[in-house]
Amino acid sequence: MNAFTRAWYALERHYQDTRHVLLRDRFACEPDRFERMHERLDGMLFDYSKNRLGEDTLQLLCNLADAADLEGKMRALRTGAKVNGSEGRAALHTALRLPDGADAVYVDGRDVLPEIRRELNRALKFAHSLDDGSYQGITGKRITDFVHIGIGGSDLGPAMCVQALEPFRRHITVHFAANADPACLDAVLCRLNPETTVFCVASKSFKTPETLLNAQAVKAWYRGAGFSESETACHFCAVSADTAAAAAFGIAAERVFAMYDWVGGRYSVWSPVGLPVMVAVGGARFRELLAGAHAMDRHFFSTPTRHNIPVLMALIAVWYNNFQHADGQTAVPYSHNLRLLPAWLNQLDMESLGKSRASDGSPAVCKTGGIVFGGEGVNCQHAYFQLLHQGTRLIPCDFIVPMTAQGREDGRSRFTVANAFAQAEALMKGKTLDEARAELADLPEAERERLAPHKEFPGNRPSNSILIDRLTPYNLGMLMAAYEHKTFVQGAIWNVNPFDQWGVEYGKQLAKTIIGELEGGTSVHDASTEGLMAFYRECRLKGGGAA
């Protein structure tokens, strides 16, 4: 039996030995529990004391990390080793946020920092030229709107950041169009003036069908407004690893910004893919975002496991996923401007870790990935929190809470924070049947006994609380980097590659075939797919569908 298997079995035995220990009892017996089980970094506090674990659990989880060679895998990530084995690539998103003066970072023997600096500065310069009005549309009018056309990692990260940093917005309004459904882009275009709008096409391969369909639709919009091809080109920029393909589309080289094949899409907001963030909040604020992420990088790569925030987040997630058989994980930002964070986390975690094969291609030997979902607090308290409190499923929760409001402070911010703290406490403590009866003491006994079971809460429902003093670019960068590194650590423990996404590609492959068959002709599919295609054709004949 190897060290990893021994560490795994030790955790399985430990779970059986401690499964009946209640969190409320742990807090009653451990008055210093919070002091021992929270970490701070700059303006962030990570409280993990409301989890079903003790110091012995943490030690066993740290043993598992050691047995998985987490330290070696972290070093490989940091130094540009090809940690994305299936695609033979490094994963150097951390290099994108290195400050000036950092040591060289090599990919295939080449220092990539000069290229990173050059492309970042080019993107920042272009964003500034839009902001100060020095770059204008073909008719000489100042640019007022910027539309980012991308999908997946080229959309979710930038869109979330722009939304989160709305209070820092400068002059230009930034829009996003991801879905190929015509209603998505049409809803944006109907509000815009083609003379005062710039469009950014973001696609690593410059072959993403949804993105190119929307980009072609924008070209048609310009033609309909009387613009020539060359005039239209002045209103386009691009971010891609295939700069030649962007040029072939008609975008001038000086407005094509490079992505890198050693950065995955869902980790790319730190690159020129973050151009809409630069446009929205300005170069100085974007650099603050990078600085916050780098602060978390330094913490991650230099802090011992027992006090390492992303590592603790990941080990706790492994504890629930693999040993307590949790049914999912929810993330709840108590901030209206962070309402897109759960969608970003959904992709980051599930696309990275939804793998049934180990890094070497053999079958995964344990349950990997997990269902990650979330919503905006306080709203989701009136939606799915009922299941968290009294349902039969175990779903750990991350509460993400800024301490200071971004909007007008009139008591509503305090109400929001109080609700976050109250929900975490209620999930942990629960309410016993006797406590429920005591609350109903004024009722007749029969009515009290009838209602009390419905007001009982099992409690012992775990959560992390991630607090930030304010929602700033720096703190947002720290928060995002913490979750990126959490995802990497989970992949390291499970021995899966968090940087590929082959499952996404297969559906795209089939869609290429089906799209040509929807209008008729020969097709060979299963009976269900054939039936769906037949119904589409029927609706089209009746005039019930659009191209």
From Swiss-Prot:
Broad class of enzyme this protein falls into: isomerase
Active site: 351 (proton donor), 382, 508
Catalytic activity: alpha-D-glucose 6-phosphate = beta-D-fructose 6-phosphate
Record's keyword annotation contains Disulfide bond: no
Cell membrane is among the record's keywords: no
Keyword annotations of the record: Cytoplasm, Gluconeogenesis, Glycolysis, Isomerase
UniProt-listed Pfam families: PGI
EC number: 5.3.1.9
InterPro entries recorded: G6P_Isomerase, G6P_Isomerase_C, Phosphoglucose_isomerase_CS, SIS_dom_sf, SIS_PGI_1, SIS_PGI_2
UniProt GO cellular component terms: cytosol
Protein localization: Cytoplasm
MF terms (GO), sorted A to Z: carbohydrate derivative binding; glucose-6-phosphate isomerase activity; monosaccharide binding
GO biological process: gluconeogenesis; glucose 6-phosphate metabolic process; glycolytic process
SUPFAM superfamilies hit by this protein: SIS domain
PROSITE patterns recorded: P_GLUCOSE_ISOMERASE_1 (PS00765), P_GLUCOSE_ISOMERASE_2 (PS00174), P_GLUCOSE_ISOMERASE_3 (PS51463)
Pathway assigned in UniProt: Carbohydrate biosynthesis; gluconeogenesis; Carbohydrate degradation; glycolysis; D-glyceraldehyde 3-phosphate and glycerone phosphate from D-glucose: step 2/4
Principal location class: cytoplasm
Family: Belongs to the GPI family.
Its job: Catalyzes the reversible isomerization of glucose-6-phosphate to fructose-6-phosphate.
Xref: HAMAP family: G6P_isomerase
Descriptive protein name: Glucose-6-phosphate isomerase 2
Organism this protein belongs to: Neisseria meningitidis serogroup B (strain ATCC BAA-335 / MC58)
Gene coding for it: pgi2
